[in-house]
Amino acid sequence: DVAPSRGLGDVYKRQVYNELSQAAMQYMTDNNAVNLKEAGLTNAVSIDAFIKKYFKIVKECGTDGTDCYGKGYKKIDGSTYNPAMQGDTTRSYILANGASISFIPNNIAQIHLDVNGAKGPNIIGRDVFALRLYNNGLIDDYCAQAPCSKEERETRFNTYCTVNSDGTWWGCFGKILNDNWEMTY
């Protein structure tokens, strides 16, 4: 078992990313659709059905994700943050691979991911990331349309990932995509 840490955690991040990507593409294929909205992925109920069909779930946390995540999350600069989303439209799960994941319907889905669940280090940008699932089935950082440009990813990283930014934590995942799955920060 590979412990997620600087460099080695890349295996876990990539595994979950690949599983999400494959599930999105398979969902469109299974529904004979050109994009996720056409396939029916439009709200919390359809996201819940998508997760249950394409992923092995060991725990459902429903609209209160706190039971799916650890305690004491921090950003790289040491500021505190809680990635467990709560709300009527949020759905949180622990997957069989140990990852904690929350889906928030928002122009398809915003995704909060802790690649190793409640286990440490619980640091945004190390084992915890914010991603987006776009209508075209791509998974990327936050931008107008996926795939995000390298410049957009770098801007998000420098603006939000490593600094206290009032609860915004985009950019960490995009930086890893830009840097070929390596944490260079």
Regions picked out by a protein language model, each given a short descriptive name:
Residues N18-G40, K56:
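Alpha-helix exit/C-cap motif
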Residues D1-V2, N82:
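Generic structural signal for short, flexible, solvent-exposed coil/loop and linker residues
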Residues V2-L8, Y12, L20:
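Single conserved hydrophobic/aromatic residue that forms the stacking wall/gate
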